[in-house]
Amino acid sequence: MKCWHNVVRRRRKKPTAAAAAKGSKGSHGGVASPRDEDAICQRQQQVDTYTWLTTQAVPLLWLHLLLLVAFAKHAAAATTIATNPEATTTTVSNYTVTTTALSSSTTTTSSGSAPALSSAADKFAGNWANLEDSFRNIVRIGDGNTVTRTSIEQSLVTIHDIATENLGTLCISTLYRPLQVPINSERYESSRQKTDLAASILQEVGIIRHGGLSDALAKGLLTDDFITGARILALNLTNGAVQSYVWWVKGTAAEIQRYDEDGLQIGKKPAGSYPWFDDETSSPTLRSPKFAPSPPNNYYKGWWTYPYFSCSQSRWLVSYSIAIPPIGRHGLRGFISIDIDVSTLRVNQCEAEPYPFGSRRQKMQQLQTHNRLGARRSLFLGSRMGAIDESTINDLQAFHSSHKCHRTSMVCDYRQPSAETPTVTGGKLLTTLTGSSSWTRGSYQCLCRGGFYSLRHPDGFNGTIMEIAWQEQQDNISNYYSEVFKCLPCAPGCDTCTGPEPCLANYHWPFRISLLTISIGCACGTFVLAGYLFRHRRVKVFKVASPIFLMITLIGCAIMYLEMVAIFPYLDTTWCIATKWTRHMGFCITYTSLLMKTWRVSLTYRVKSAHKIKLNDQQLLQWMVPILLVMLIYLGTWTISATPTAEVILDQSQLKFKQCSYNWWDHSLAIGEVFFLAWGIRVCYNVRNAESLYNEARLISYAIYNIALVNIAMVVFHVMLFPNAGPDYKYMLGFVRTQLSTTTTIALVFGPKILRVFKGQGDKWDQKAKVRSITASFSLNGVGLVPEESPDLYQENEELKEQVQKLAHQIEFMKTVHMQMNNRHLKPKPGGYFTITSTSFQAPYSKNTVSTAQTQTGKDENSTPTKLKSPKGKVXRGQRSVKDCSIEIDGGQGRTTLVEDAIEFNFHLADTEKGLIVQEDERPGSDEEEAALIAQFRRLFAPILDDSLNLYYQLNDLDDTEHVRIHQTVAQMNDLTSSEEETMVTQVNSPSPPPVGVELLLPISSDSSTASSSLYAIHTPSPAHPSGVLLMPQNLESPLLSGSDAITITEQVELHNPPHHLQLLEDENNTSCSLSSNLTDSKTLDGRTPIVV
């Protein structure tokens, strides 16, 4: 189709020439007639059909036959590429592997090649593995032609014989020795086009009509740089005899000479030994075995020969011949042929990238094919295959990758042979005959690849020796090729070596397995401990330590233990990723959980305000999650963007082993962890003096110190002290770091707790913590010493603040009381709660060691029995004191005593006042009611006074000492002076609202040298509070005596006599009973407010 298309295109381009051709009566004036063009296209179509049958149909039949034979014999052995170079292939653009069968183009090769191919087919059929060789046996060169491996090997033998003068009778009997491999004709495309043009001219003009035209055309062809000889023959169409010929050759000095050949004689046929000529009678279409097949998709007017050696010219030549058809039936048939010297080309048997000849579009197509097949080509081509360069322009591409080096262990290196290069037979290369030494078999050196070595031939193996050794192995003469001429593999891990010395560091597997077993056991023990903690999470020793944070700590420790699993095997990318994640994520989880608990203690310990800092587990988890999220995002980004890989490092013996790479991701994370450790150390330093339940804060601080110290120490060991340590030493350092940091943390945090549980003290509170008054704020879970049901912390805080305020008010109240009692240096405040009635200070102790507590109420005219309740309408009740008081009452018949406690309240009447006591005989049961009233008084005031005095004297030891000294001085002064006071006692027996008569006695002077102060009180029953006691203001005007003068009502209360063997300070403390009320509110009691019991 392409031929017909070209014909149509030429007709359109030259309509004038076609018209001239029609009027010339069949003569051709330089333009082919349509009839000739049609004949040419028909002949080309026949040639293409025949080519397809010989190159594709027949090989397909052979392929099916080989498959059937292979499946029938069931071969199991496989011959490797190293021992069978025939199994190699090249897959560049001109070496594309085809799927045609192992067969020759029956008419394209010499008669001797068919038996060789048949024997090769029989050889391959017996082995299934060698079936692949049939696919690799046929290769394609740059211009599209195909060639078999057998043809290549036979051509190499021919080249070797010629190069080593092993010619025999070649140049005597046979002047030409052709090869069986085609040459890439694209390099001589310009020469071919010139020859086609000359053939077209001769065809149009005619050979005999112009005698000088043939000489002119032959000489013109010699102007081409590549053409060294041109010949034009005029042959008889009937018998094929030579009618005339011209043969011009280019001399050594570039002069043109006529060449006379004995094989060409007028009237005789040309000799059949000429490789550039074939008779049309034997080969009508000139598809002779002497000619190489034309490249596909290309139309040539003539045929290229195989390269051949010319003994007469002593050079390697290739010819292009064109048969010129006759003009008529009885005309002459022309024949034109040119010779191109290819002696300057070289036989390069190594892998090389072919030079892309042809047009620009063809070069681009070849480059695209080269890029597309690059991955597959790298499996077969040597390591020296590089980019397309100018050094391959002179290579015979058919011989590429035909070397005999072992493919897996050797690489071919082309060496240009010199004239002095010796051969195996002891001779030298033929340079006088060939004029060049580039046409030599074995012009290469087999060098050991990286990872292989040869002790006998460290510089490589000579290519000629490798060719002979391979041929001997093929002929079963010797096995030196596979046993002697080979490279041995280096020890594992060696890129290059010169011997069998090891390159990888040795791994002591029993030692590593023992450390791994311990680490896995610790990880399993951590999970068991987590289950034990979950089961006993309600035990107080675990509950106060936040079980959720303890569980998180155990999870982090288990992850840190698993790092030993990640660094156990030979490291690669997967294990390096696992190493980074287990190391840093485990550290972050463990360290953060411990730090959060310590931070809670730090914040509570440093607080200076009265506000409660509420830090429960949920809040700490909310602070912990962002820290873990930052680490998670960092490790994820690291893994995706710059995946950690295993890099090779050297130990002190220069042995290699793999270690995970360290880059700026590691350095940045290390800096962040250092700052994190520094913050943890700062927090632990702040709580160094803080007290906590079970001493947990201090143990966690020790654990954090230990983690920081161990990590810093291990960095120093790895980087500074042992930078070239071997893999076992590094694994041991990792084990030590894991055990010192993780196991020690578990022992410090969980060891004391588990020990207490085993001792049966898990549910018992820490007694030392109780003694140190450890509150809930200093507990690591924010609860402290609490029952099972935790109360509201805010309510607890408010109650504590209220108690503190009440105690402060009581202390201030007692200070005022003790300052004003019997202190003559202070002027009493009018209307105060305690008022001294006499300006003369009375001694607290009389001569008979009886002290009198004097109390006087202020005067309040509006004080009535109906206003005897507290302002809030509640009755203020006292609390029973731990230190009870006993009360004695002197009645009319004698002394009535209530002995319930160690301290007594004695109500004595002075001797001078006994006569003024109102008779109570008319009221039955007065003594019992009086005793009940006094008991109520004791229960109200005694406990408050006792607790307040104890607290006051504890806080004011110096003031208490001075107070006792003042009392001693006043007592001595009272011994020298005496005074009398009038005392009146009235008893009101009627509870009814109407006025009841009260019998009053006149005051009688007391015989005692000392008199007590007055405590004014009225004993009046009331409906709400029968037999109640009402403390009235001073100078209270009785409603019974409203018309008379105000009468002062007193009641003397005398405390019991202190023991004589006690010191004065102790006596002073024991004689004090509380007179204050422990009310529900925290306000200071007003002195004028009545208290109802």
UniProtKB/Swiss-Prot annotation:
InterPro entries, A to Z: GPCR_3_C (IPR017978), GPR158/179 (IPR043458)
Residue numbers carrying Phosphoserine: 519
Annotated keywords: Cell membrane, G-protein coupled receptor, Glycoprotein, Membrane, Phosphoprotein, Receptor, Transducer, Transmembrane, Transmembrane helix
Subcellular location, principal: membrane
Glycosylation sites recorded in the entry for this protein: 94, 236, 462, 476
Protein family according to the UniProt entry: Belongs to the G-protein coupled receptor 3 family.
Cellular compartment(s): Cell membrane
Spans through the membrane: 52-72, 513-533, 548-568, 585-607, 620-640, 661-681, 702-722, 731-751
GO MF annotation list: G protein-coupled receptor activity
Residue spans of biased composition, Polar residues class: 849-867
PROSITE patterns xref list: G_PROTEIN_RECEP_F3_4
Membrane topology: Multi-pass membrane protein
Organism: Drosophila melanogaster (Fruit fly)
UniProt-annotated stretches for the region Disordered: 12-35, 849-881
Record protein name field: Probable G-protein coupled receptor CG31760
Any one cellular-component term (Gene Ontology): plasma membrane
Topology, Extracellular side: 73-512, 569-584, 641-660, 723-730
Additional detail: This protein is translated by readthrough of a stop codon. Readthrough of the terminator codon TAG occurs between the codons for Val-875 and Arg-877. There is currently no sequence that provides the identity of residue 876.
Cytoplasmic side: 1-51, 534-547, 608-619, 682-701, 752-1093
